[in-house]
Amino acid sequence: MPLQNLTPPPHTQIQDNKSLKQNSKQENKDENNVQNPEFKAYELEAVTIEAPTFGEYQKYQTGQVLDNKMLESAPSGNGDITSILRTLPNVQFDNSQLKSTTPGEIDPANISISGGLYYQNNFQLDGFNMNNDLNPLGSAIGGTRADSTTVSNTPGRSQGLNIDTSLLESITVLDSNIGAAYGGFTGGVVEANTRRPKKDFGASINYQISQGNANPNAFSLTQYKIPQEDLNSFLNSSNSAQQPHFIKHSFRSSIESKINDKLGIIASFTTMQSFIYLNAGDSEYLKNTLEGIKKTQKRQSYNFFIKGNYDYSDTLSLELSYAYAPQYNNYFLAGVKDSGFDFLTGGHQLGLKSQKLNALGLLSTQASFSYMDSSRTNSENYFAYWRPSAEKNWTVDKSATQTYKWPQEGGYGNIDQKQINMNLKTQQDFEALQTSILTHNFSVGAEFGYVNAYYERVKDFWWGSYYNLHPLKQGQSCLDSDRFCSASPVYFQGTYSGESWANNIGQFVGYGSMYKKGKIALDSVTLGGFLQDDIRVDLSKAGTINARAGLRLDYDTYMSKATLAPRLSLNYIAPWSAWEYGKNFGTQITFGANRYYGRNLFAYRLADGQSALEYGISRSTPGAWSYESHRSTTNFQKIKVPYSDELMAGISQEVYMFALNLKYIVRKGRDEVRRMCADANGNLLASSSECKWAETNYTARYIYTNEGRSDSDILSIMFGNEAPIKLGAMDNFFMLSYDRTNIYRNYTDFNTDITQAELNNEMIYYEGIGFIKLADKPGSNFGQPITFRLSTTHVFPFYKTKWSMNNFFRIRSAYNAMARIEKNSRLYPDKVMQYNGVPVDTYIKFKVPWTFSWDMRFGVDVNVWRGNTLSLAVDIFNLLDTTNMYLLSGDYGRASGSPMYETGRQFWISVGYKY
């Protein structure tokens, strides 16, 4: 089905009908007539408050909607709500999202909307926020961070809940000219709206499978793109950053009932399961003392959902919903005994909505509670290195002197991170106030929220360092409770660091760290409100002017900052748009000037104090430890709230059933958050490494500042049909889009350390551009310069079957990935450019070629008996198995500067049954 445009809905959805009274009857008439709640009229006595219908021109070119039919017909893959947004312009993905080395992952994709950072979008489920503000930077699960996660940190993701699209009626993406009802973003708003019950009784079940095996002689539904010289090491991978063999299972089910004209209930259960088969360790490790030669890592996502709708009267409607969406990602540390652990994300969300027609118009109120996790569980509370011995024997090099060959065991300990939110929102939409040529539609809203976020190390964790392993000598013994002492003689009999291991009877750890159990917590109260007037000026034969002016106020006790965000959108509708013979050629012109304030993440505060839980431990003989306390490496201080100023202009043109939309967006992000290493007086230090060891050696501390900035300009064009093109009995829809994106940002994310050069905005050399200021350097990710997209849907009924095919074609332009050479480089001094005789940081380009992909879904629905439908479908990603390269910018000569490849052709096969 076609993509749709819309004017931004209020915080709380209005009913899907012209009046609350008509709701049940209308839904029973046509279960497929799904419309966005805002775009229907509601009646109160003789007064009618109207808004554009779902298919009308959007007044302010705010965004797009993917409706239920688009969600069902498009290739779904993992089924997360962001991956399917690849069909939309103004939405950019992480360069490495489709990488061929990690096809077994199931986490939702990170997206940038209109140049914003991926963790500065506002994700909502039925109007309730589901943002992860604990630590969204940890989203690189399946990359290098997963197996080498630090002792104190855990991965996260930008979305608090991983919601499956099978639950949804629509996904709304707001990317510009966003009304004052929305706050807490500098990117965009993604609103997932769940389905309502429509049938007297209905049920559905669906199973989907995909798998991959990189072994050239094995059956595989997934084609890997691995360089031949890397294939052998990839096939023997023991690291989740390289996944040569996986299988995915998806199970989806739902049940619904319109019990009567007033009450309806819908419930669903979905799960996505991925099993990734890896070696327990590389060739340096014996496997017989581990759990087995092969180990299986798991990714398991669950969605439990129930929602009830109750029309209490003609003027009052209630909706209650509950979602439980946990995800368990299981890992192990390669070659490390007893090292399994889980990352737990997701959680609970409970919401209640009411909609009341009153004397003023429509009053919408909603209350919600959410409980979200970002925790590490099931991990051992110790980690130890050992020299090889009869007891510590899981290494092939019995006399190993290199520490990476030494036996290791244990995990990093359990960490409990929670984000608990309670929110209350209310909004009054007033009945229209009309004069001779003016019509005012006022809206006012208020919000109250409370959040408790905390980081807790559940138990004491002990780390035994390889720096100070000592021989256990004659007359010494190990205590039974001492995990860091072994009475098994070590094979090594030489001398190390002046200490003889001859005739040893074992070994013990003499130095390490103890991370004491403890909790770091914060509470924050948020207040918000907005006022908005949507004005219509009827100029008769000269057309119509619409103006939406709004003001949004937000305050929170976390940063103790109040922000005031003006929003202004203007729209002109040409006069012929209303003529009998001109309405098929309607024209609209749109302008906008808006400010959006983002969110300050709780990670800034929770980082302060984590390293203070660490104690240095040491001993010269087996027995008691001596302790040395450490200080925090981060000093939290209140900072400003990041914001983005937006200017936009657009034009919409209708030609019969076709619509052309052109939009140009300019955004300037300021006061954006990044990290710096500072001395006790807050002055920038020359090297951020001074902060990494601040717990013992320095008074240096990491601090978060508002030195980040960005500039974006995006041009997008969309053209498609709003009604089906009939070819016999076949309905055909298509949507063609183009976007051109330029993003300039002086950092990557909030943990990117500031350098003195950046603070001074020094000159750099950027190959292909020349000498520029550092702040003018193009962004290195989420900024594909040019993208063409074509989406087509074809539906053909035949006898008792319905055949459907969806195609999605995407062409992405070539781009330059940049490798940096520092101005004082000793390895490549001949490549460093000079500006006025002074060496400057030099960025060397690597040309990444154009890429093409074709994704397809082909399905058939068979009416087997009285509306009982059997469904079969095949999803094919990268149908032509093209080799698409990507490259992450990094330092010159490093691995990050090596080309990588996206996944090749991949099949998903599904079967379902619906009643």
Enumerate the language-model features and the residues they cover.
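Periplasmic N-terminal accessory/gating domains of Gram-negative outer-membrane beta-barrel systems
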Residues: 21-36, 48-50, 54-179, 189, ...
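Short loop/turn motifs that connect adjacent beta-strands in outer-membrane beta-barrel proteins
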Residues: 40, 180-182, 197-203, 255-263, ...
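N-terminal periplasmic accessory domains that precede
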Residues: 111, 157-162, 173, 185-209, ...
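Transmembrane beta-barrel wall of Gram-negative outer-membrane proteins
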Residues: 202-204, 240-328, 344-360
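Structural signature of Gram-negative outer-membrane beta-barrels, strongest in the C-terminal barrel
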Residues: 441, 447-451, 517-657, 664-666, ...
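Gram-negative outer-membrane beta-barrel transporters
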Residues: 539, 663-821, 912-914
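C-terminal beta-signal and adjacent terminal beta-strands/loops
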Residues: 675-677, 799-804, 808-834, 849-853, ...
